[in-house]
Regions:
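Absolute protein N-terminus
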Residues: 1-2, 102
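Short, well-ordered beta-strand segments in beta-rich or mixed alpha/beta enzyme
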Residues: 2-9, 39-74
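Short, low-complexity, polar/charged sequence segments that are solvent-exposed and flexible
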Residues: 24-27, 56-61, 77-82, 92, ...
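Glycine-rich beta-strand-turn "strand-cap" elements at beta-sheet edges
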Residues: 39-54, 82-102
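C-terminal structural segments of small proteins and small subunits
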Residues: 67-91
Length: 102
């Protein structure tokens, strides 16, 4: 199983728009072959160090059956459209961690 943590910095005032964009494709993504989990998350006030609340970060937590399934996910037409639409909402890019269990 492959785990993905993808964090995106959105422009101030665009977080809700970005969340709606992600929600608009979530049903399609979860139906993709090999998708185990596709969860949209945002920061909360936890009071736990070292977390710093950032209202402009959106984090996807994903699980895929294999690296091949993840790679296929990135080539599907609805993802190409998603990446195109998100350009106007994102600032500073994103970070991606692709992990496997130790």
């Amino acid at each position: 199983m492959i785990h993905v943590i993808a964090t995106v910095r959105v422009k101030p005032g665009r977080r809700d728009d970005f969340i709606e964009l992600v929600k608009s494709i979530t049903g399609q993504v979860t139906e993709e072959k090999g998708c185990i989990r596709y969860i949209l998350t945002v920061d909360i006030v936890s009071g736990l160090p070292p977390q710093v609340l950032d209202e402009n970060l959106v984090t996807m937590i994903e699980a895929w059956e294999s690296l091949e399934a993840l790679r296929n996910h990135l080539t599907i037409p609805h993802m190409a459209l998603f990446f195109e639409k998100r350009k106007e909402m994102v600032e500073g890019g994103s970070s991606l961690k692709v992990l496997q269990e130790a």
